[in-house]
Design a protein with these regions (language model features):
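Donor nucleotide-sugar binding/catalytic pocket of nucleotide-sugar-dependent glycosyltransferases
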Residues: 52, 73, 171, 181, ...
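Conserved donor-binding/catalytic core segment of Leloir-type glycosyltransferases
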Residues: 243-261, 267
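A charged, aromatic-enriched C-terminal amphipathic alpha-helix characteristic of glycosyltransferases
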Residues: 383-393, 400-434
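Nucleotide-activated donor-binding/catalytic signature segment of Leloir-type glycosyltransferases, i.e.
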Residues: 283, 288-290, 295-321, 378
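Membrane-proximal helix-turn-helix segments that form the acceptor-binding/catalytic region
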Residues: 36, 118, 126, 132-137, ...
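A conserved catalytic-core segment of Leloir-type glycosyltransferases
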Residues: 53-126
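N-terminal subdomain of nucleotide-sugar transferases
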Residues: 1-81, 207, 216, 273, ...
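Nucleotide-sugar-dependent
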Residues: 261-264, 316-318, 322-323, 330-349, ...
């Protein structure tokens, strides 16, 4: 083996089954984290076979992984989401007005709860069985040694659980981008059942990975080996725009959860600065790209004309990145409670990769992890929704700098060192280090 083909790990054959309902180039935010793991496993010397969902063309963009995939099979989807997509779904997600209908909201509630999410949730029962039997065949034919799955949806973890029961030699790594809703909201009637289910499910996992300490604290109730991977920043220098945008642009990319996220505190502060003559209203431009354009419009249209609101449901990845790189400020809207902490969106790391200023608005209590991560990148920019004075002062500074063609210092080099691809690769080596024997195959 020559130097070009040498990898981080030893040279023993390591064959990974990458079981992921979402997989690039599907245009959802989770694809970014999935892509990072895929690249990390390649760097650690794995041969990878992929089982994933077969999505409509409008959900897929350009290929974003230019690395070798040994085998890939896209499973037809027949779940509740697929059923609705033929009638009322917009870009594979329900409009917010439909979600407020009693019947639909009740159905969605069951769809997200254990055990119903395994039957009618994303993926569904047909996806589950096709993936399981395809995986059984691949494990035997391709001598699979490792499994990787990522929640959500939970169905991938359950398939891995079944495979681990069938083939005990497999080394299973389970990733949680978020907690299952039944664990996240203890007031649900099936909370005890969900805890029992998750505890027995994760007994079969050899390693568990999650995005933050907050979620790790919850998962420690179900597993002893919790590892944290928040995200990574490429060490490659980004090409920053040489021309400052003619507008003071606020850019938001991603989904919106209207019961938890709230843009109105920012809008109120900006309107106050306009009223005081500090900001010229005509300088403002709002850009949005994501699955919930209607809610974003609801926040803005009472206060700003249509020509100052540029909203797209879907954009190709290069165009979305161009918006982020041209923005005066990239927005992160998150939330935090005494029960639910550690909500880290992958969009934060996507923003940090651009070298442009980031504003994090938290609805609720202080989110220390998010604030700490941002502190490696810029001196200010994290605010709770109630911190009107601090937010007002920061926006004033940002606007004056933009008006004077001055850039705001963002230390992309420092954040790239702190959350490097090497750190990611080392974590993957750690959680996958056990090389199983080839028994019972």
């Amino acid at each position: 083996m020559n130097k070009k083909t040498q990898t981080i790990s030893n040279y023993k054959a390591k064959n990974l089954l990458f079981l992921s309902y979402y997989f690039p180039p599907v245009q959802v935010s989770s694809s970014i984290r999935i892509k990072h793991f895929f690249e990390g496993f390649i760097a650690n010397g794995f041969t990878i076979s992929v089982l994933t969902g077969k999505f409509p063309k409008k959900m897929t963009g350009e290929q974003t992984i230019n690395l070798p995939i040994s085998n890939i099979y896209r499973i037809p989807l027949f779940g509740l989401r697929r059923l609705f997509s033929n009638f009322i779904l917009t870009h594979y997600t329900l409009p917010l007005l439909w979600k407020k209908k009693v019947f639909i909201s009740s159905l969605l509630s069951f769809r997200n709860r254990i055990p119903f999410n395994l039957i009618i949730g994303d993926g569904g029962l047909i996806y589950l069985w096709i993936a399981y039997f395809k995986a059984v065949k691949w494990i035997k034919n391709y001598k699979i040694t490792h499994l990787f799955t990522s929640h959500s949806p939970l169905v991938d973890h359950f398939i891995a659980f079944l495979l681990k029961c069938t083939f005990p030699h497999l080394h299973w790594m389970a990733d949680f981008r978020d907690l299952p809703v039944d664990i996240k909201y203890p007031h649900y009637m099936n909370y005890s059942l969900s805890k029992y289910f998750l505890k027995h499910l994760l007994k079969k996992a050899d390693a568990v990975i999650t995005v933050s300490k907050g979620i790790a604290n919850e998962l420690e109730k179900f597993h002893t080996k919790i590892n944290i991977y928040s995200g990574s920043i490429s060490s490659e220098e980004v090409q920053r725009p040489t021309i400052i945008s003619p507008y003071f642009t606020f850019n938001y990319t991603g989904s919106i959860y209207p019961d938890y996220q709230d843009l109105s505190p920012l809008v109120k502060v900006i309107l106050s600065l306009i009223e005081e003559g500090i900001i010229n209203k005509k300088d403002i431009l709002w850009t949005y790209c994501g699955l919930h354009p209607f809610k974003y419009e609801q926040w803005l249209t009472p206060h700003f004309p249509n020509e100052q609101i540029d909203i797209k449901a879907f954009l190709p990845l290069p165009e979305a990145r161009e918006r982020q790189q041209m923005a005066a400020i990239n927005l992160v809207l998150t939330w935090s409670t005494s029960i639910q902490k550690g909500i880290l969106t992958t969009k934060l790391f996507e923003y940090l990769d651009t070298g442009r200023p980031v504003l994090v608005l938290t609805n609720g209590v202080l989110e220390t992890e998010m604030k700490r991560i941002l502190s490696f990148y810029q001196t200010e920019g994290y605010f709770q929704n109630s911190e009107n004075k601090g937010l007002k002062n920061w926006l004033t500074t940002m606007y004056i700098r933009w008006k004077n063609n001055q850039t705001y210092h963002c230390d992309r080099k420092k954040i790239a060192q702190k959350f490097s691809e090497d750190e990611r690769n080392a974590l993957i080596k750690k959680v996958s280090d056990k090389t199983p024997t080839r028994k019972n195959t």
